[in-house]
Amino acid sequence: MSKKTFEELFTELQHKAANGDPATSRTAELVDKGVHAIGKKVVEEAAEVWMAAEYEGKDAAAEEISQLLYHVQVMMVARGISLDDVYAHL
């Protein structure tokens, strides 16, 4: 599996949101559905991170965290929030 940086993933998601077909791109589909649908996925994935961290191993928790980060970045793309916008608050 190829590794991506947070920045590389964000750039890829921006491209998919702008150019992807919602019928074939999960990212484009989520952005098309809007902030409410994306928000539901963020909450779902956050709960899965918690459960994996508490009851499963390191690998399961890491996988769930990666899915949470994906959905958070999709939310950022949908709302027009840049990485620099977020970095300003770190």
From Swiss-Prot:
Its EC number is 3.6.1.31. InterPro entries: HisE (IPR008179), PRib-ATP_PPHydrolase-like (IPR021130). It is found in: Cytoplasm. One of its GO terms (biological process) is L-histidine biosynthetic process. Pathway: Amino-acid biosynthesis; L-histidine biosynthesis; L-histidine from 5-phospho-alpha-D-ribose 1-diphosphate: step 2/9. The keyword Zinc does not apply. This is Phosphoribosyl-ATP pyrophosphatase. It comes from Streptomyces coelicolor (strain ATCC BAA-471 / A3(2) / M145). The lineage of its organism: Bacteria, Bacillati, Actinomycetota, Actinomycetes, Kitasatosporales.
